[in-house]
């Protein structure tokens, strides 16, 4: 029964592999339960969508530049023709700096992970080896029941 699951197997699998691929029922609700179980086990959770990530490594761990939409306004003779660049701090590295000392680490829960390329998924597999306090959960699709598998096993199959 879904209501009686404790999530211990999920947490153990995440701690062992560092990056998991998840298939969840499309009606939703299961992700929140497992995120809550991660938080009760001492992890902080950050949910983000794979759409619009751009360069995953720069977005998560490096300072990167973004250009806001121009909204029809132009700066004639000032700056680049394509608009100004604003530099944004890395999302995951910034969250790691603000973790409490008793926290086990940060879990990046990435929604709509099926749009990520194989190279981006390989980077997400290597991220927990680069920074041991980061764990990664990528939602890769729908299933009739909530199931997970190490992300590197899923990449090897694809």
Swiss-Prot record:
InterPro entries per the UniProt record, alphabetical: NAD(P)H-quinone_OxRdtase_su_N
Keyword NAD: yes
Keyword Thylakoid appears in the UniProt entry: yes
Principal subcellular localisation of the protein: membrane
Pfam families associated with the record: NdhN
Protein's membrane topology: Peripheral membrane protein
EC numbers, comma separated: 7.1.1.-
GO molecular function: oxidoreductase activity, acting on NAD(P)H, quinone or similar compound as acceptor; quinone binding
Superkingdom to which the source organism belongs: Bacteria
Disulfide bonds: none
GO CC entries: plasma membrane-derived thylakoid membrane
Known catalytic reactions: a plastoquinone + NADH + (n+1) H(+)(in) = a plastoquinol + NAD(+) + n H(+)(out); a plastoquinone + NADPH + (n+1) H(+)(in) = a plastoquinol + NADP(+) + n H(+)(out)
Keyword vocabulary terms for this entry: Membrane, NAD, NADP, Plastoquinone, Quinone, Thylakoid, Translocase, Transport
Location(s) in or outside the cell: Cellular thylakoid membrane
Record-linked HAMAP family: NDH1_NDH1N
Job of this protein: NDH-1 shuttles electrons from an unknown electron donor, via FMN and iron-sulfur (Fe-S) centers, to quinones in the respiratory and/or the photosynthetic chain. The immediate electron acceptor for the enzyme in this species is believed to be plastoquinone. Couples the redox reaction to proton translocation, and thus conserves the redox energy in a proton gradient. Cyanobacterial NDH-1 also plays a role in inorganic carbon-concentration.
Oligomeric form and interacting partners: NDH-1 can be composed of about 15 different subunits; different subcomplexes with different compositions have been identified which probably have different functions.
Similarity section: Belongs to the complex I NdhN subunit family.
Name of the protein: NAD(P)H-quinone oxidoreductase subunit N
Species this chain originates from: Crocosphaera subtropica (strain ATCC 51142 / BH68) (Cyanothece sp. (strain ATCC 51142))
Gene, per the UniProt record: ndhN
């Amino acid at each position: 029964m879904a209501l009686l699951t404790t999530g211990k197997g999920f947490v153990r699998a995440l701690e062992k592999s560092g990056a998991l691929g998840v298939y969840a029922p499309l009606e939703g609700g299961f992700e929140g339960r497992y995120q809550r179980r991660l938080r009760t086990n001492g992890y902080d959770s950050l949910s983000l969508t794979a759409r619009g990530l751009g360069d995953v490594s720069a977005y998560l761990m490096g300072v990167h530049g973004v250009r806001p939409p121009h909204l029809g306004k132009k700066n004639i003779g000032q700056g680049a023709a394509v608009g100004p660049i604003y530099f944004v701090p890395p999302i995951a590295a910034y969250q790691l700096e603000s973790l409490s000392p008793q926290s086990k680490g940060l879990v990046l829960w990435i929604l709509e992970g099926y749009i990520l390329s194989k190279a981006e998924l390989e980077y997400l597999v290597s991220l927990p080896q680069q920074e041991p306090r980061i764990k990664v959960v990528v939602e890769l699709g729908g299933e009739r029941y909530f199931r997970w598998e190490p992300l590197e096993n899923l990449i090897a199959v694809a």
